[in-house]
């Protein structure tokens, strides 16, 4: 079975910001825009926003508009207004709209745009973000790309709108690597796959002949590390997405599990299972293939995840009796327990913002996804149920993705949830899905 490998090498497919802040596109603005979202104040009311169909010679403009609206709505911060309520029909997206028509339907912000095909076959995508109550333009940008990248253009535009109105980077122009699960429960086939963050453009990167688990992106998005049972014993592998080349990470005599990259992409941290049933944490330097042991205990130390600055590692250990969260220096120094609640903890992952650690918690017959400050204080459970597991952070540290299995028949599915715990959404995938890992923003 031939597997298509994704080319994630950074390419110049977009010519962005060509007209940003150009006099023909951007109006004079005060230092502070009237419309904005305070993303830091907890639960907020979604901002009503009107997103008009981008003008185009075919259905593409409407398709791009739908993706933008879906991205923004799924974040929980925006409430796209039904197009049936629109009063003004936009015929020239470059011209100032009739702001009164949009204020009548309480559109706090307005998006207009156009898609045109260039003589060289590329697409030109233009959009404008308007502050309707302030009566001014907030953004005017244009992008050039190939027709097959139209969905990515939509995600980039959604990111620009998100950032302008919240002050935070967006997370829509990203991918997720995960485990696709198909077939009956007794003969489940698990393949590694990559998709856009909204579930579109699924591509398989393994054939399912060997059980593969816990895939994780490298910081440059060009590699994936994962665990495979090829040969019968779990080992950690490194896969080059552009070429499909694969190599074993560390020639350890025992089983290696739970791999993850360091923030600079130069190391992989993982756990090595010992003959006595214990597991210790090691790193392998990808530059010279040297390995370093970080923990030495009779316990099971696993699930290591670096802080974004690379100075610390959070991991799970049962050295105190049951699995709890610990933090140590990146060299293995000064390990200290940070979780003090009831239950067992697993799959910790440090936020890209550096302020929180997400985890899975098992307590009182339920599996929960939660977050805690890096010193263990302020623990909050965001969602609980029969089986929730494996949180992964969006690159802006505002949203988590995880997998859930309901009681009874069936298999796991992917969900996202924000830090309020109120905005939970299922991500549609072709089959059952587990073990998601979010990529950094694409470039």
Swiss-Prot record:
Signal peptide residue numbers: 1-33
Main location: periplasm
Keywords on record: Cell cycle, Cell division, Periplasm, Signal
GO biological process: cell division; protein import
Any single GO CC term annotated in Swiss-Prot or TrEMBL for this entry: periplasmic space
Family according to the record: Belongs to the TolB family.
Subunit structure and binding partners: The Tol-Pal system is composed of five core proteins: the inner membrane proteins TolA, TolQ and TolR, the periplasmic protein TolB and the outer membrane protein Pal. They form a network linking the inner and outer membranes and the peptidoglycan layer.
UniProt protein name: Tol-Pal system protein TolB
Origin organism lineage: Bacteria, Pseudomonadati, Pseudomonadota, Alphaproteobacteria, Hyphomicrobiales
Gene coding for it: tolB
């Amino acid at each position: 079975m031939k597997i298509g490998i994704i080319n994630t090498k950074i390419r110049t497919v977009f010519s962005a910001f060509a007209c940003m802040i150009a006099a023909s596109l951007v109006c004079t603005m005060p230092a502070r825009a009237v419309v904005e979202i305070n993303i830091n104040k907890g639960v907020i009311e979604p901002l009503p926003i009107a997103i008009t169909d981008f003008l185009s010679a075919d259905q593409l403009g409407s398709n791009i508009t739908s993706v933008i609206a879906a991205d923004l709505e799924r974040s929980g911060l925006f409430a796209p207004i039904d197009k049936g309520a629109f009063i003004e029909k936009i015929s020239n997206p470059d011209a100032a709209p009739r702001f009164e028509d949009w204020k009548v339907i309480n559109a706090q912000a307005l998006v207009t745009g156009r898609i045109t095909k260039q003589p060289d076959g590329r697409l030109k995508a233009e959009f404008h973000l308007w502050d309707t109550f302030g009566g001014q333009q907030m953004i005017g940008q244009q992008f050039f790309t190939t027709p097959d990248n139209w969905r990515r253009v939509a995600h980039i535009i959604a990111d620009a709108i998100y950032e302008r109105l919240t002050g935070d980077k967006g997370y829509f122009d990203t991918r997720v690597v995960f485990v696709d699960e198909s077939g009956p429960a007794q003969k489940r086939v698990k393949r590694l796959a990559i998709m856009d963050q909204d579930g579109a453009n699924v591509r398989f990167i393994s054939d399912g002949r060997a059980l593969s688990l816990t895939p994780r992106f490298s910081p440059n998005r060009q590699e994936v590390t994962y665990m495979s049972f090829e040969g019968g014993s779990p080992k950690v592998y490194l896969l080059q997405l552009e070429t499909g080349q694969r190599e074993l990470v560390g020639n350890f005599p025992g089983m290696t599990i739970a791999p993850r990259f360091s923030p600079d992409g130069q190391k992989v941290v993982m756990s090595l299972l010992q003959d006595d049933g214990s597991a210790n944490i090691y790193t392998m330097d990808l530059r010279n293939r040297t390995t370093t042991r970080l923990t030495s205990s009779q316990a099971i130390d696993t699930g290591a995840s670096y802080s974004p600055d690379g100075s610390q590692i959070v991991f799970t250990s049962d050295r105190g009796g049951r699995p709890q969260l610990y933090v140590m220096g990146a060299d293995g120094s000064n390990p200290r327990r940070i979780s003090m609640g009831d239950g067992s903890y697993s799959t910790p992952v440090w936020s890209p913002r550096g302020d929180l650690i997400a985890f899975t918690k098992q307590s009182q017959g339920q599996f929960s996804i939660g977050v805690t400050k890096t010193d263990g204080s302020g623990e909050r459970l965001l969602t609980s149920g029969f089986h929730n597991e494996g949180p992964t952070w969006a690159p802006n540290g505002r949203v988590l993705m995880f997998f859930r299995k309901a009681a009874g028949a069936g298999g796991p599915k992917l969900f996202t949830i924000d830090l309020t715990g109120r905005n939970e959404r299922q991500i549609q995938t072709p089959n059952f899905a587990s073990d998601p890992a979010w990529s950094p923003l694409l470039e």
